[in-house]
Amino acid sequence: DKSWRPSSSYYLFDNYKSSFKVKDGRDLNQTYQIILEPFKKKWIPSLKNSKLISNNIEISEDYFNQIYVSRDLIDRKKQISFKRYKTNYYLGEDLKDYYTKTPSNISNRLKTWVLNNNSSTPTEFLNKLYNNFSDGSYYYNLSPQNFSGNNYENFFFNLKEGYCEYYAGTFVLLARLANIPSRIVTGYYGGELNDVGDFYKFKQKDTHAWAEVWLDDKGWVRIDPTSAIPDSNVRNTLNNLSLIHI
């Protein structure tokens, strides 16, 4: 059951726009370009806090999830320009409620784990949760066993083996059970630096999933639970993942 994940962002933004505000935005005077090869998708990757400034592509701006979506499939090479900005976000109570929603069939075992790890601050709980994945019992594997029964319970307590989406999804679910607004984010990780052209090249094999949590004093904070896995527990190809501290 993945009903807790965002699905209809435009409808949600229309209903929650009074709860989501951008404050004190300012230009960082940083621009960059992305060259997209044809990949038959509509979404447009970008760095965080970026404004599209190209006029050579028709897009829909998804304010709710802070992403750009092309109106047409990207079936030819495109060079797209962005400008970065710095901003502070305010998340209203309606959106905080939305980002803490969970499926109705969550197992009592997961709820009990959250209660047993009750913390005085969100950061303390998130550190406990992150460190739980670094205890040596979890493994990274691109070809794990199939889930059965309650997927997240089975992964967290029994299987303990999977790829980035398993870890990000479980992390977000447990954070939400602790009443911490959170969401899954997908994108690219790593890439290859071209020293001659001074650019990074990303391939589909570089796709990755991680978590973002909302902290009132910091806004959306990126946390990659997959990076907690010890190198010795990697059972399939995985680039070294840098730790993200709160």
Model-derived regions: residue spans:
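A mature extracytoplasmic/lumenal domain signature
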Residues: 38, 84-86, 144, 186-188, ...
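Hydrophobic/aromatic-rich core segments of domains that either
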Residues: 1, 166-239
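Short, contiguous acidic/charged loop-to-helix segments that flank catalytic cores in large enzymes
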Residues: 154-163, 198-202
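Generic secondary-structure boundary/loop-capping signal
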Residues: 9, 135-137, 152-154, 199, ...
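Acidic low-complexity segments
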Residues: 51-158, 178
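Short clusters of hydrophobic/aromatic residues that line enzyme substrate/ligand-binding pockets
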Residues: 4, 140, 223
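Intrinsically disordered, low-complexity N-terminal segments that are enriched in acidic
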Residues: 1-93
